[in-house]
Amino acid sequence: MAAGAVFLALSAQLLQARLMKEESPVVSWWLEPEDGTAL
């Protein structure tokens, strides 16, 4: 259930960023990790 909660939190973060058209540090890190690896 923890994984589901994390997934929902990330989805909500991405949705909010799209609606507000602002990039939060979390979204930027999620889409473009500094180490160049995909989660």
Swiss-Prot record:
Source organism: Homo sapiens (Human)
UniProt superkingdom: Eukaryota
Keyword Secreted set for record: yes
Family: Belongs to the BAGE family.
Localization per record: Secreted
Secretion signal span: 1-17
InterPro entries in UniProt: BAGE-like
Presence of the UniProt keyword Magnesium in the record: no
GN (gene name): BAGE4
Entry comment describing in which tissues the protein is expressed: Not expressed in normal tissues except in testis. Expressed in melanoma, bladder and lung carcinomas.
Function: Unknown. Candidate gene encoding tumor antigens.
GO cellular component: extracellular region
Keywords of this entry: Secreted, Signal
Pfam families membership: BAGE
Note: The ancestral BAGE gene was generated by juxtacentromeric reshuffling of the KMT2C/MLL3 gene. The BAGE family was expanded by juxtacentromeric movement and/or acrocentric exchanges. BAGE family is composed of expressed genes that map to the juxtacentromeric regions of chromosomes 13 and 21 and of unexpressed gene fragments that scattered in the juxtacentromeric regions of several chromosomes, including chromosomes 9, 13, 18 and 21.
The protein's name in its UniProt record: B melanoma antigen 4
